[in-house]
Each structure stands twice: as C-alpha cells, then as structure tokens.
Regions:
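Conserved beta-propeller blade repeats
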Residues: 46-64, 89-121, 149-169, 238-259, ...
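Short loop/turn segments that connect beta-strands within beta-propeller blades
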Residues: 76-79, 136-140, 227-231, 274-278, ...
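Asp-box/WD-like beta-propeller blade repeats and closely related beta-sheet repeat scaffolds
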Residues: 90-222, 231-238
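Loop/turn-rich, solvent-exposed surfaces of beta-rich toroidal or solenoidal domains
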Residues: 305-308, 312-317, 333-397
C-alpha cells in the first residue's frame, strides 16, 4: 500500500538546480565500452518505471516516466518530452513532512497494453480515498475510473484494461508492522529526491531488517480484482503471507503473476493465479537449502516467466525461464560479475540486458557495476546425453559492457529495459547526483570525434563529486 513512499526526500526543486541541469551533458560515448549514452530527461529526480512494469504505449512511440512535477511522456523518435499529468498543488495543510505532500500526488500504475493510456492513482482529500484514473498519453485527457476502499492499493492493470489488481490489509495495521511505513525518507544521495515517484527503485536503509519484521507480522491481506467500470471487487485469496509484485500477463487478461514477499531464502516467491481465483500455482519450487528465485518478469509474448535464480544464494547465477505453454524450463548461466539486480529482454528474446550491481549486493561482485548487454546461447545437448522432459535446458550469457556505472549509487536501482525497436537500453541513474533517465545505444558508436569520448565515471564526478558507497 505504501510502496511509493520510499522515494521521497524533498518536495521543492531549487532554481539553481534547474539551471545546473542545463549544463549537464546530453550525450557522450563511454570510453570503456564504445557505446553512446544519452540523457533523455531534464527533470532532476526524474525516473523510469520499475523494470517489469510496462512504460511504452502500444504503438511503441512513447515512453512514460515520472518526475517531481508529475507524469511525463518521452517521444522515442524525437527524444522530446512533455508533461502529461501534473501533480496537484501542495495542500495548505500538508505541513513540512514530504510524505504528506507525496500522499496527494499522482502515482503511476502502468501504461496500458490496449490504448495509449497511462493508469495512475490520486488521493481525493475530500472523499479521503484513492481513485484510479487513466490519461491519454498524447492528449493528456484524464478519465476518472473507480475509487478504492480504505487500505487498498492497485498495482497492475490487465491486458484488455478492464481489471485492476491489488491488495488490502483486512484490519488496520500498526505502523511498526507495515513495511517501510515508519522509516525515514531516504537521503538525497540516492538521487530520488524532489518528490519523484521511484517506488521500488530505491533500496532503503535497513531493508533486510524491515523485511524480516514485515514477514514475521503475518498481516492478514486480501488479493483482489476491481472492475474498472463498475468498481466491483472480487476476492482472489486471503492470506497471511506478504503478497506483492502483482503483474498481469501482457497478453492474457485473465492471468496474474504475484509473489510472496520477504527474504528470498525464507519464501516460495513466484506464483500465478487466474482472475477467477483458480489455478493458484507456484512457479519455482526449490530443492536446495538457500536456493533463491525472484525479480520475476514476463516475456513480451506472455509465454514465459523469467526470474533471477541463484543455486545457492550468492554462489551460482542464472536467469531462469518457465514456458507456460510447453512447461519447459531454461537456465542461462552467468558469471558473478555479470549478475544484475534486474534483467530484461527484447521481443523474440534475442537479446537480454542487466543493470549490474555494486559489491554490496547479493553477488558480492568485485567488478559488477555495468549496464550489460547479454547475447544468449543455448548449449548443445550431446548425442546420447540423458535429457528428460523435466530437465532444465542449459544456456549461457555472453556479456558486453554498455555503460560504466562505477559512479552510480546502487541504492537507486537502474531498472533496465529495451526500447521497442531494440536499439537502446533505457535506465535510471543518479551518477550526476539527482536521478535522470538515460539511454545507451545497443550498437557501438562509429566515426567518433575524440572530444565525444569520455570516461562515464570521470564525467559524472565533475557534476557529482561525492563517490557512491556500496549498499549492504
């Protein structure tokens, strides 16, 4: 319910900061990789969506992102941006607490799969309830859909844009039990500062302890659907597990993926259920102590669920896929330095990408701070080799560095995604201090002038002299 509150550390942008933004570099070629990096947004505190949440319009021409002043759209061809849904004025009674201001802002859910709409919620201070809206990304026209009951949130919209899914606590929850509700706003070092809605992008201080506390609380929750026309709510399940990361299939409007939150080694995380409440299925069942699986996402064709699989935790690394039609399982192996917090892929699954991680992440990678491009290769099964129909099919990633992220503070997760034309990997970074959305071209740059080539960490340090400290 409070997943977006983590991104707030302020609520006003100073004019000198805006002036400084105009001097930030817009484009350069990374000296260490040979790939061109482009800063796509101008707003300090701007941020892309969480890695597995759709940000692109169905026509593939627009990408939605958030900034302190509201919801924006980026034209992918011209790289021009515009404000689509502004944040409302700060309420007079909001006080000095940035959380109070944040509560009344607009909060994105997802970009629709059927229409060029971005779905979002906004709190109605008069009715004292959250309301779901959608806005046309091109015209900005806003349509009010349905109101939510107390304690309820919506996390995803289905493929035909008829249903939302979310959770609510069955009882009022003490603040000390709800994950993140009583924690301080994050330090500005993350870059997710002036009111930007980064949501799951920011790794909070004390995250592990808070997750343990929330899991142990066993708070009764309801997973539900809500009809976006009538407001009718349908219960899918009651649970005292910590339910989160709901994500509808990109093609099947009746199919929902969700997870049991908590320390990964303590939960069976990845689940699938239908909108009639049937076929509640665990996607990955462990068979080793300390085996973990998580950060799940859909393939763009809706046939495969992909996820980070470590066998065991922090020692051996795979990107695993489960095909819902064939029930076949694929595992692409990677090296420690290639592991990433999040992964993503192209249509057709010909290329994958990852956002790397600093030495404080689970992989403890000594040289993992890169935006990576992965070329997948399935391994040949030798003639005569035993290959049961239930066996994992093995593959390997061949990695290519795209961006040197050594000056990025990984407490803000980059959350990579490919552009629809597969020509660019898009990510969020605070390398310049405040967060911005960047792109890096998949193809290497050519015909370069020497003045165009820079070390990304050295360039970033000119504008942000503070060196990042590893997460832990």
């Amino acid at each position: 319910m409070f997943r977006n509150i983590f991104s707030i550390a302020g609520f006003l942008i100073a004019l000198p900061l805006l002036a400084q933004t105009q001097n930030l570099p817009v484009s350069w070629v990374d000296k260490d990789t040979g790939h061109r990096v482009i800063r796509l947004t101008d707003e300090p505190g701007s941020s892309g969506f969480y890695f597995n949440v759709n940000a692109f319009t169905p026509d593939g021409k627009q990408m939605v992102y958030t900034a302190p002043d509201g919801i924006h759209a980026l034209d992918l061809a011209s790289q021009k941006t515009r404000l689509v849904v502004p944040n409302p004025p700060r309420p007079a009674d909001a006080g000095s607490d940035p959380r109070a201001y944040f509560r009344f802002g607009v909060h994105t859910i997802v970009v629709g799969r059927k229409t060029n709409s971005v779905f979002f919620t906004k709190f109605d201070p008069d009715a004292k309830q959250s309301v779901i809206y959608k806005a046309d990304v091109y015209t900005g026209e806003v349509t009010k859909l349905v109101a939510l009951p107390p304690r309820a949130s919506v996390a995803t919209i289905n493929a035909d844009e008829t249903l939302g899914v979310g959770t609510y606590d069955e009882n009022e929850t003490p603040p000390e039990q709800e994950y993140g509700r009583n924690r301080p706003a994050p330090a500005s070092a993350t870059g997710a500062t002036p009111g930007a809605q980064a949501g799951n992008l920011v790794q909070p201080e004390g995250k592990g302890e808070m997750m343990e506390r929330r899991l142990a609380a066993r708070i009764p929750v309801v997973l539900y659907t809500i009809d976006l026309k009538t407001g009718k709510m349908t219960t899918l399940l009651h649970s005292t597990d910590w339910i989160g990361h709901m994500l509808f299939s990109p093609v099947d409007p009746t199919l929902l993926m969700y997870c049991h939150e908590g320390p990964w080694q303590k939960v069976d995380r990845i689940w699938m259920i239908h909108t009639d409440g049937t076929h509640n299925i665990l996607i990955h069942k462990r068979n080793m102590a300390m085996e973990i699986a998580g950060h799940e996402f859909w393939g763009l064709d809706g046939q495969t669920i992909w996820y980070d699989w470590q066998y065991p935790k922090g020692e051996d690394f795979f990107l695993a896929g489960y095909n819902l039609q064939t029930h076949k399982r694929t595992a692409y192996h990677m090296q420690r330095n290639e592991w990433s917090i999040h992964f993503n892929l192209t249509q057709g699954e010909t290329l994958f990408t990852g956002d790397g991680g600093d030495p404080g992440q689970v992989a403890k990678a000594p040289d993992g701070e890169w935006i990576e491009l992965f070329h997948p290769q399935m391994l040949n099964v030798m003639e005569g080799a035993i290959n049961d129909s239930d066996f994992w099919q093995p593959g390997v990633f061949h990695s290519e560095h795209l961006v040197n992220m050594a000056h990025h503070n990984y407490r803000l997760e980059p959350n990579v995604r490919f552009s629809p034309d597969k020509k660019m990997v898009i990510f969020t970074s605070n390398m310049f201090g405040h967060s911005y959305v960047f792109g890096v071209e998949v193809s290497k740059a050519d015909n370069l002038a020497a003045s165009d080539v820079h070390s990304t960490p050295e360039l970033a340090s000119q504008f942000n002299p503070t060196s990042p400290t590893p997460t832990h």
